[in-house]
Amino acid sequence: MAITKIILQQMVTMDQNSITASKYPKYTVVLSNSISSITAADVTSAIESSKASGPAAKQSEINAKQSELNAKDSENEAEISATSSQQSATQSASSATASANSAKAAKTSETNANNSKNAAKTSETNAASSASSASSFATAAENSARAAKTSETNAGNSAQAADASKTAAANSATAAKTSETNAKKSETAAKTSETNAKTSENKAKEYLDMASELVSPVTQYDWPVGTNNNSVYVKIAKLTDPGAVSCHLTLMITNGGNYGSSYGNIDFVEISARGLNDARGVTSENITKFLSVRRLGSPNLAWDNQLRYGLVEGDGYFEVWCYQRAFIKETRVAVLAQTGRTELYIPEGFVSQDTQPSGFIESLAARIYDQVNKPTKADLGLENAMLVGAFGLGGNGLSYSSVQSNVDLINKLKANGGQYWRAARESGANVDINDHGSGFYSHCGDTHAAINVQYNTGIVKVLATTDRNLASDIVYANTLYGTANKPSKSDVGLGNVTNDAQVKKAGDVMSGDLDIRKETPSIRLKSTQGNAHLWFMNNDGGERGVIWSPPNNGSLGEIHIRAKTSDGTSTGDFIVRHDGRIEAKDAKISYKISSRTAEFSNDDTNTAATNLRVSGKQHTPIMLVRDSDSNVSVGFKLNNMNAKLLGIDIDGDLAFGENPDHKQNSKIVTRKMMDAGFSVAGLMDFTNGFAGPWEAKNISDQELDLNSLMIKKSDPGSIRVYQCVSAGGGNNITNKPSGIGGNFILYVESIRKVGDTDFTNRQRLFGTDLNREFTRYCSNGTWSAWRESVVSGMNQDVSVKSMSVSGRLSGNELSVGGAGVLNGNLGVGGGATSKMPSSDKGIVIGRGSIVREGGEGRLILSSSGGTDRLLQLRPAGATSLDNQVEISCTSASAGDTKISFGQGAAIRCNNAGSPIISAKAGQMIYFRPNGDGISEGQMILSPNGDLVVKGGVNSKEIDVTASQSLPLKETTATTGIGVNFIGDSATECSFGIENTAGGSAVFHNYTRGASNSVTKNNQLLGGYGSRPWLGSTYTEHSNAALHFLGAGDTSATNHGGWIRLLVTPKGKTISDRVPAFRLSDNGDLWLVPDGAMHSDLGLVRSIETLNAAVPRFNAPSIQDGRGLKIVAPQAPEIDLIAPRGSGASAPAIRAMWCDGSLADTTRYIGATQPGSTFYIGASGHDGEKFDSMRGSVAIKSAGGWGPTSTPTQVVLETCESGSISRLPRWGVDHNGTLMPMADNRYNLGWGSGRVKQVYAVNGTINTSDARLKNDVRAMSDPETEAAKAIAKEIGFWTWKEQADMNDIREHCGLTVQRAIEIMESFGLDPFKYGFICYDKWDEHTVVSEYGPANEDGTENPIYKTIPAGDHYSFRLEELNLFIAKGFEARLSAIEDKLGM
């Protein structure tokens, strides 16, 4: 037979670069026919089989190995079982039933072991069969893996059965030896299972070896580290410079990040150390030469949520490290290629650490893009590149023909968006375009513009319009003037002007403006004698002003400027002299005076007069500037005194003194310096103390010995405070208390301070590592050991929250109060806690008696194990023996166990496990199943052996066949006809229907109407219930029942029905039975607890039937069929109880929107549509009917939903008093904006419900649109004067309600009442002005808080009464503008007085 062997290797091309063949697996395929007859399908099928065969065979080997291990475990467990059985024979006893179970479990173990053997044999057979042909390799490997898995499972069952055998054997007493024998059989069977599993493993391994010749799969490992809320650095490889040979490692890493996402990235990591020494090391610039990372996947996944890779260079080598952030788990690594001079530490040899290794240089991942995950311009380094549009932006334009009009052209352009274009008009059409001229079109917002350039002249035409005008067939056209299209005289309004190279105008009066346009224009006034004037006149010839210059001479030249009022008044000229001097009677300089020196010498003898006064609105009316890096000062000098200088030094600090160098003068302490902190060389004495934060010295991250922190005689101060503010900040701090790393505060306190060698200190340290306080003392430089602090009481009692005792704890009494915890064992009366079993907790007394708790919470009492071997319980008192209960045993390891009662009765269990119950001699033994004091049904065993049974003796089982009859006992405990099956099982008496043929087992209630009529609406058709025993009889009806009822009269077209569940509340009788659960015929679920509805309404199952029973209820019946209905008094609730467990409690009421329908055969489901709404609302009864919702919280879809966009908004809706319309009031939009749902309508807060504080980044934006306001009027004189007066009242105040608080902050402003008084004093009505506000309210009651819930679980609101009251308020922004106008008036008046 011809054999063909083909070797194939996968090829991949990425980014136009060939990938080396060594990265991808080879497949060796053997086909059982000649090369000439091989088809492509044969090759494909063989490759797929080979690819699957290798992993399957490998899995078969793994499963078989696991089967062997499980069988070995089974053997070990069987050995343990045998040992336990031996111990059982000498230690304890149990029931015969337990022994039988043990034997059965051992038998199960044997059976499972045989199953394991058979499964292993199956694995062997499948493995052998899989070698028969290459085309069946994959299937055979899968079967082998499955069979080996079965072997593993059965072996596991064997181990479990052996474990059951061990447990049962431990409890066995009567048949301990039998258990040992059965366990031995289990051991033998498990050994057989191990042998068979080993055979299966060998066969699978043999098959794997054969399959590995055909398949060479990629080696894949688990990433060695998984992170939770921590991050680590992991060393995964080391590569050494190979010189001229190869050194290469290629890895494919998957699932390396993207926590919480349903998809991830694949990282291809290329590593090579070749050329390392030539490159003279690894840098951030050349790292990609040695470590290159290509990432395939969605760019939407954050780059910092993935594995990141880098190198740490050594001498001739480098290590490869990965930074693994939090919550990266279950990552896989495939080795695509590996040469020599490489060391891979995966899966073994890796190193992980929390801190970044020294010298770590990261190589950023380069992304591989595909058709779905496309790069952005930024990814390609083309942020500023222009995108080429569909119609020529950056490319070629479009051409349009047969354009009929300007409107037609714009519509054509609009259809294709912004573009380059050219067009040709239809013959005879009136279109403002240059035929075949190129142009540009833009559409921005609702505006359009088209520019068209004639190709042979350059003449430009422009078309413009808006969407509204375009819809009305309006387009504006314009032809631009230029050198190729010059305007005529008439085009520019000069049709009547003669143009002969200049404009000529006769006469010396011009009616228009005169413009002089040249590089250096000028007007010359040439005076032959006298003054030269430039006059400014009124139309009537009256003078407004003049600029004139009198004749000059050798010593004087002047220019005068004069202005006059309308009545000809002028009180002074402004004169500019030739020497630069200016003269003015009253000068006002509005901006700046520049001068070398200025001196003001006031000869006024009035000492209260002012030499210089500077006023204005500027925040810096005087600025002293020195063109130097040195000091600048203001001087003060009196006679017979050196000048005092106030100024700033070169550091900008404010100082005062006599030295020109302010560095030598005293600094002035400013608020900024106080806030920032400053040093004081001398001792500061705070007579009244000080308040505010006390900042400790930060010693974090310092190398420091706490022993060095002392206060000696020469050291200033009595207390010093130090703080380590981080967990790692104390790594280099020594002599801390044990267990303290960082995060602590240390107080050093001076107690004695006689000299530098005669002093006493104390150190107190508080740390969060242990949440403890520690103290130690220093005497003359020698420190005592650290001790944990405790609290002492007046009577020397010690009360601690938690205390660890390493030695002995002595004293007369130990009290652990409240919920206190004693974490450890306790020895009492000399008891040694070392006798306590290591895993238990308890009390050891005296010679060894123990009260302890076992590992599963069992309470265990044990004596000291002496010769008495007794436990005595004395309920009547410590010395009362008559009522004691005594537990004893005859041997420490076997023998009898006995419970003796003080009255003489006893219960004993012998060594074989049989219980013996004995009474005092001559007394009887009573068995009372109905209770200690109830003799009914009792059984009595007399001293002579008689057995008296007060009841029937029933057989264990009754088999009813066709030849037998089962009598039924008639019951009188019910109305009507009733029969009972009588049973006496303490566990269960059941009645059932058994179907052994595969069909259903159903119990039906068949009901007819009277006289063979149809059943009626709400007729009880059947039910099931429970009737408890009352002591002498059963209840007349069920205390809990399930009823089936008809919905409407039955007919050929109506088979309607509904269900109700009736219960009787605790403490009530069946006459108070409540139909608490009703499942209506329309699918509604009604929950009606006790007291919610009268018993007359027991048949209500819908809104429709409730309206009929209670006409005034009058609720909309359209609510029927919509789901859950809960009727309860006061406070119906839906309680979502969600124990947290190991996750997070997150109960939810969730609406699930979608398009489509599940009600028809299409079953189409589509994306959520805009406007889908989820309401949480309330409706009420208006006295006539229930109406629709009048208040709601509505969650809405703000737009259509898709995979990348699911916008929602939340809207709060209410109905105001006096209205029946529900309106949306406030909403949170899809972008998070809190917005009122109507403009200029809703307030935040009111007079007696004010918002305490509003935090914002920017100020509020208030509408001030001129289109919405009347004209702004000027303020009257009284208003201006009132504004000035109000400004003078501004000061600081505090809230009266904060009078008893510390650290009260002062607020700046004034009261409304004072502002009202001032305005009224100027004859103004304050309440005509918007900045004066007044609100009042009537007395009303509100809920202030909710107390503990009522006994019935309803809410417990606590009300308070808000008394009638009122508030005065300001609109501060308007008040500030009002006051600002007063400031402006004052400043203007000052400027006028200064002549400015």
UniProtKB/Swiss-Prot annotation:
PROSITE patterns on file: ICA
Keyword Coiled coil recorded: yes
Coiled coil location: 187-214, 1263-1396
UniProt keyword terms in alphabetical order: Coiled coil, Host-virus interaction, Hydrolase, Late protein, Protease, Serine protease, Viral attachment to host adhesion receptor, Viral attachment to host cell, Viral tail fiber protein, Viral tail protein, Virion, Virus entry into host cell
PTM description: The cleaved C-terminus functions as an intramolecular chaperone and is removed by an autoproteolytic process after correct trimerization and folding.
Composition bias, Polar residues: 60-69, 189-199
Pfam families: Peptidase_S74 (PF13884)
Site (Cleavage): S1264, D1265
Ranges of residues in domain Peptidase S74: 1265-1394
A molecular-function term among this protein's GO annotations: serine-type peptidase activity
InterPro entries on file: S74_ICA (IPR030392), WH-like_DNA-bd_sf (IPR036388)
Region (Disordered), start-end ranges: 51-133, 145-203
GO biological process: adhesion receptor-mediated virion attachment to host cell; lipopolysaccharide-mediated virion attachment to host cell; proteolysis; symbiont entry into host cell
Residues that span the membrane, as ranges: none
EC numbers on record: 3.4.21.-
Name of the protein described by the UniProt record: Side tail fiber protein pb1
